[in-house]
Curated annotation (Swiss-Prot):
InterPro entries per record: Mesendoderm_Regulator
Other remarks on this protein: Down-regulated in 12-cell embryos from mutant worms lacking skn-1.
Protein name: Skn-1 dependent zygotic transcript 1 protein
Keywords assigned: Developmental protein
Lineage, opening ranks: Eukaryota, Metazoa, Ecdysozoa, Nematoda, Chromadorea
Gene name of the encoded protein: sdz-1
Any single GO BP term: mesendoderm development
Organism listed in the record: Caenorhabditis elegans
Length: 239
């Protein structure tokens, strides 16, 4: 049961729910003065003024597990706000590759050039900005007693990516699982076992007895000693 809990915890930390976060940046240029109304779903709606042949930067914040977004464009008269064209939507890819994509919206009265690129929000990185990074920037300044003299002792920045956190969590839980198994093996009750060495054969029992025999004037005395595993015989001859 505990192993299933460990595996579930590992899966939770190794495969966390992540979402992308970044900005879709536009450079808008029209060939005449006009108003441009932009809409993205129900979360974004804005109207900006464009001057003839002047680029206007604009950014749309995006968040979620998406790879592309549709944006509606509608050109309006710069003074009355009357529609100069129907609302048209364009689809933009959310790829953090540093490249600019160009589109042209051509109407009867206004030609609109749309250049777009996508970049990550601070703290995110990756091809679609779906990986988080944690930045640590501890700073410490030490001032000496000498007026006008300051010494900066420590200033460093480093990032810990999601991959490092994932691998560290996985290694920690694997180590914890190994320790748990070792504890189970150490505290397992020991069973007494008896071993019988079959190579020794069945034990022999000898009785302690002494006897002598006379033959042809010679006396031979035999003494037997008991032993559990072997027997020894001492022979003494008296001539």
């Amino acid at each position: 049961m505990l192993r299933y809990i460990f595996f579930a915890a590992i899966l939770f930390f190794v495969f966390p729910n992540t979402e992308s976060a970044g900005f879709l940046k536009f450079e808008l240029t029209a060939d005449r003065d006009c108003l441009l109304h932009l809409e993205h779903s129900s979360t974004y709606s804005e109207t900006v003024r464009l001057l003839a042949y002047e680029s206007r930067p604009l950014e749309i914040y995006t968040q979620g597990s998406i790879n592309e977004i549709p944006v509606h464009f509608q050109l309006l008269h710069h003074f009355s706000g009357k529609a100069l064209s129907e609302a048209k939507f364009q689809i933009f890819q959310l790829k953090n590759n540093g490249l600019w994509d160009s589109k042209v919206i051509d109407t009867d009265k206004v030609i609109l050039s749309v250049r777009s690129t996508f970049y990550c929000e601070n703290g995110y990185f990756g091809p679609i900005c779906d990986r988080r990074s944690r930045t640590f920037a501890p700073k410490s300044d030490i001032q000496t007693s000498t007026p006008g003299y300051q010494t900066q002792v420590l200033k460093f920045d480093f990032k810990i990516s999601d991959d490092i956190i994932i691998y560290s969590s996985l290694a920690f839980f694997v180590l914890l699982l190994i320790i748990f198994n070792c504890i189970l093996c150490c505290y397992r009750p020991k069973k007494s076992q008896k071993y019988l060495d079959v190579s020794l054969g069945s034990p022999k029992v000898f009785s302690i007895c002494g006897y002598s025999a006379d033959k042809s004037g010679n006396t031979t005395e035999y003494l037997d000693a008991p032993s559990r595993f072997f027997s020894s015989t001492k022979i003494e001859c008296v001539v």
